[in-house]
Amino acid sequence: VLQANEIKAAPYHAGLDSAKRSQTQDDFLMERIDVIVATIAFGMGIDKPDVRFVIHYDIPKSLEGYYQETGRAGRDGGEGICIAFYARKDLRKLEKFMENKPVAEQDIGRQLLQETAAYAESSVCRRKMLLHYFGEEYSEENCHNCDNCLHPTTKIEAKDALLVVLQAVAAVKENFRCLLYTSPSP
């Protein structure tokens, strides 16, 4: 899709032979290509200071991993933007990979995933959360840099409205049809 839109991109993953991976890495470092679509293995050992974007298509397995991977962006002091796409099904998929591991390892893996999911779903300053996770404190309430600080979510109390909806569903014994009608704009 990227190449079809004239973006110079290349894949990088374990399924490629080492010569192809090496060529892709060199092309990226020498700026012959602009985008690498890669597994997490690509970022390890790459020291390219002017990376501007790190995009996760799946949720990372841990906050340590996320921090390491997103740390590739903006190393030169320029802007670095990190985007993580995340859905609950990602957690279920990662939990499934842990099923045949020893129980203690499963417990640790689940804890790491829960911490990563909490980070992804939180409305708290991301810098504050990461620093706290790594044992440091950040006294400011707003870093003026992360998505939560730049675009705070408005919170509303919806308990009463939700109770009305649940009572309505119970009243029709969950056997209903829904018709949505939106009147045309004048």
For each of these PLM feature ranges, what is it?
Residues V1-N100:
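Helicase motor core with emphasis on the C-terminal RecA-like subdomain
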Residues L91-S123:
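A conserved SF2-helicase RecA2
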Residues C125-L162:
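Cys/His-rich short segments
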Residues Y181-P186:
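Conserved small/polar residues in nucleotide/adenosyl-binding loops
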Residues G65, I108-Q111, C125, D160-V164:
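Generic recognition of stable, solvent-exposed alpha-helical segments in well-folded globular domains
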Residues K159-F176:
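Positively charged, polyanion-binding regions of nucleic-acid-associated proteins
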Residues I59, R75, A84-A87, Q106-G109, ...:
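Generic alpha-helical segment signature
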Residues D50, K93-F97, L112-T116, M129, ...:
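A general alpha-helix detector
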